[in-house]
Amino acid sequence: MIKQRTLKQATKVTGIGLHSGKKVTLTLRPAPANTGIVYARTDLEPAVYFPASAESIRDTQLCTCMINDDGVRISTVEHLNAAMASLGLDNLIVEVDAPEIPIMDGSASPFIYLLLDAGIEEQDAPKKFIRIRETVRVEEGDKWAEMKPYSKGLKLDFTIDFSHPMISKDVRNFKMELSAENFIHKISRARTFTFMKDVEYLQSIGLALGGSLDNAIVLDKYRILNEEGLRYKDELVKHKMLDSIGDLFMCGYNILGDFSAYKSGHGLNNKLLRAILANENAWEFVTFEDKEQAPEGYRIGEQVFI
């Protein structure tokens, strides 16, 4: 059968919080089968726990932010979430000693390295997938996000549309089937991006204090300000796809479906996930006893790092 996955051992890393600009330590710990993905604020006494869920996301203005009923928050979970989703992790305790996950270099690549360095092991319990049964679509103006039935894995098709000389039509769309290999080699290094005018405004109101050219792509009216340029020619749309993978994994399960989006962001991604889960006819839990019947990316030999 396709089994659940966790880490072989605990691991930690220290970085900077995107909004606070302060040091943050992230610790990832193995968890027993059927625990799920659980975030924890360990700087509070007692520690506050956040099981992964679509409903826990209550702020999507600048990132994907979990907030509980007492107003306790953990921000910027999407890049770590995307890394966990791509590696098929099911059970993990994510501890952080601040209100946000460290931004690292603005991509998911440092989290991939951290997870693989700790090692991934299978557990003696069947892995649950969410399989899409009916098409669900959400819209906001000209923006939209949609999930259609597709049982072979998670298919992704993302389009951005920015009026900027550095964002030409040939770098606005990207398509990919989610697997560890595709994620690591094709999109994991894609960094978050922003515009200089937005950075100046955010920092004036005390946000994005940890943002810099070391952890984001910054564009002015005409060019990219980062001296090293882009890591991929289509890095911007690839990062938006990376974000969507992390946002959809807030349900705590790998999804089998066909996701497509136009100008979507954290808010619309979460709105789609909530709409899917609210419609009991739109999805179902499935497990796979026969590894040969498993979705793409989860078959024996396709995840060679286990």
Curated annotation (Swiss-Prot):
Cofactor annotation: Zn(2+)
InterPro entries the record matches: Ribosomal_Su5_D2-typ_SF, UDP-acyl_GlcNac_deAcase, UDP-acyl_GlcNac_deAcase_C, UDP-acyl_N-AcGlcN_deAcase_N
GO-annotated cellular components: membrane
Keyword terms, alphabetized: Hydrolase, Lipid A biosynthesis, Lipid biosynthesis, Lipid metabolism, Metal-binding, Zinc
EC number(s) given by UniProt: 3.5.1.108
One function term, GO molecular function aspect: UDP-3-O-acyl-N-acetylglucosamine deacetylase activity
Any single GO BP term: lipid A biosynthetic process
Catalytic class of the enzyme: hydrolase
Taxonomic superkingdom: Bacteria
Catalytic residues of the enzyme: H266
UniProt keyword Hydrolase, yes or no: yes
Family that this chain belongs to: Belongs to the LpxC family.
Function: Catalyzes the hydrolysis of UDP-3-O-myristoyl-N-acetylglucosamine to form UDP-3-O-myristoylglucosamine and acetate, the committed step in lipid A biosynthesis.
NCBIfam families: lpxC (TIGR00325)
HAMAP family: LpxC
Protein name: UDP-3-O-acyl-N-acetylglucosamine deacetylase
Organism: Actinobacillus pleuropneumoniae serotype 3 (strain JL03)
Gene: lpxC
